[in-house]
Amino acid sequence: TVEDFALLHPGGSLGKRLSLKISEIMIKGRDIPVVNENTSIKDTILEITSKRLGTTCVIDASGTLVGVITDGDLRRLLEKTLEIKNITASEMMTKNPKTISKEFLASFALQQMEKFNITSLIVTDETNKPEGIIHLHDLVKLGLQSR
């Protein structure tokens, strides 16, 4: 299997790529796009734009992940209405976003992105608080590709 190859050949570049954990390559800290439920659409767009990932996590007052907003969500909202001035993050977010643990292999993250047709996964801890994000482009840059 792919996992066996990575374990047997850890020194080679292929082995390194195959054995990379999400924790080793995820975007962390201040670079994670995050807004709270009451954030205005204007500030949400600014957060998505400034972090350059095409998405943002939405958290509640305790810091728990409650949703995600993507560029696509914003486009779909604008297709419905141009009256967006008073809309908050909680009103436009997708609830129950796809998440992943930092302990998984990066190759598994790629499989999940392909399975759900998404470009990023939020890395959460055991209490569902965001601790990172992983983007498809980062996986491709590492040389990971689908089977």
Predicted regions mapped to residue ranges:
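Bateman (tandem CBS) regulatory domains
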Residues: 20-32, 86-97
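The conserved cystathionine-beta-synthase
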Residues: 35-52, 59, 78, 99-118, ...
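Phosphate-binding active sites in nucleotide-utilizing proteins
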Residues: 43-92, 103
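Cyclic nucleotide-binding regulatory module and flanking cytosolic helices
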Residues: 3-26
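Short, surface-exposed loop/turn motifs that are enriched in glycine and acidic residues
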Residues: 11, 30-38
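Short beta->alpha transition motifs characteristic of CBS
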Residues: 1-10, 53, 65-79, 118-119, ...
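Structural motif
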Residues: 31-33, 55-57, 66-68, 90-91, ...
